[in-house]
A protein has these predicted regions:
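Cationic, low-complexity basic patches in intrinsically disordered or flexible, solvent-exposed regions
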Residues: 5
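Intrinsically disordered, low-complexity regulatory segments in eukaryotic proteins
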Residues: 13-21
Length: 279
């Protein structure tokens, strides 16, 4: 594909200047995509840019999130995190894990992604979705017009499922493990109050809703979790195993529904991702 949106390496925002630069480049790219030409700039503006680095700059102030800056919220959410990190409800997982993987992102996010359980990379780093599947998830999030830090990402199971000694890889969480750990996720959702949630893979769907069904049977239509609309879609690991454009398009169609539900703008280029016109 010539316009594959999920193959670009993600550059982390290091400071406020980089954040502003990334946002500016994103806006300029959208202008080009929507109008079919590069935006123009006057020679006077270019001269100003040449001398801009000589002036003292102040860090950009991020726009406050709804509910951010509430000391009580921050204290209680931090308390939930600490309690989760200390959990030993599954003794076998408490013994085998490197650390509990609580979740990451904006605790006031309007969009929340839920996976099944940490893998080896996540267990080592203490953050969900940081391996190859996580890198693909980040690209999907960015193709939607978000930054990874704008959304919230968590798993049904907070500990990596244990493996027999000498055996590599990851295993699926058991129903009992997910049932035991689910209250932690439910409390996270209660705090975050996302407008929309996305479950990634059949195991996450089972762990959150108790639905033992194939994702192919339910994807593309809205489900419900205590009044929060849920879109079930394939796990990014599935897309790594199955590189068919048709499968990528299915996931992207699910994400387009999410964007529409959130009232987010969708460019014509975004609507064409993984279609014949983009091949």
């Amino acid at each position: 594909m010539s316009a594959e949106p999920w193959i670009c390496e993600r550059s982390p925002v290091k400071d406020s200047f980089q954040q502003a630069l990334d946002q500016t480049l994103s806006i300029l790219t959208r202008i080009k995509d929507d109008f079919g030409r590069h935006p123009t700039v006057s020679s006077e503006s270019l001269e100003r840019l040449k001398t801009a680095s000589t002036h003292e700059t102040r860090p950009l102030e991020a726009a406050p999130d709804e509910g951010s800056g509430d000391p009580r919220f921050e204290r209680e959410f931090a308390g939930l995190r600490e309690a989760t990190l200390a959990c030993v409800k599954c003794p076998h997982l408490a013994r085998s894990r490197t650390q509990v993987v609580f979740g990451v992102g904006n605790p006031h996010a309007e969009l929340m992604f839920v996976g099944e359980a940490p893998g080896a990379d996540e267990d080592a780093q203490g953050e969900p979705f940081v391996g190859r599947a996580g890198q693909l998830l980040t690209k999907i999030i960015e193709a939607m017009g978000f930054r990874r830090e704008d959304v919230y990402i968590a798993n049904v199971l907070k500990c990596r499922p244990d493996m027999p000694p000498g055996v590599s890889g990851n295993r699926k969480p058991t129903p009992d493990e997910m049932k035991t750990c689910l209250p932690w996720l439910e409390k996270q959702i209660e705090f975050i109050k996302p407008r929309v949630m996305v479950t990634l893979g059949a195991t996450a769907l089972e762990g959150l809703l108790g639905a033992t069904t194939a994702v192919s049977k339910v994807r593309g239509r809205w489900l419900d979790f205590h009044g929060i609309p849920i879109m079930a879609t394939y796990h990014p690991a599935y897309l790594l195993r199955n590189q068919l454009v048709t499968e990528k398009r299915k996931v992207w169609e699910d994400m387009l529904q999410v964007l529409e539900r959130l009232g987010r703008p969708i460019s014509e280029r975004q609507r064409r991702f993984f279609t014949k016109t983009e091949l």
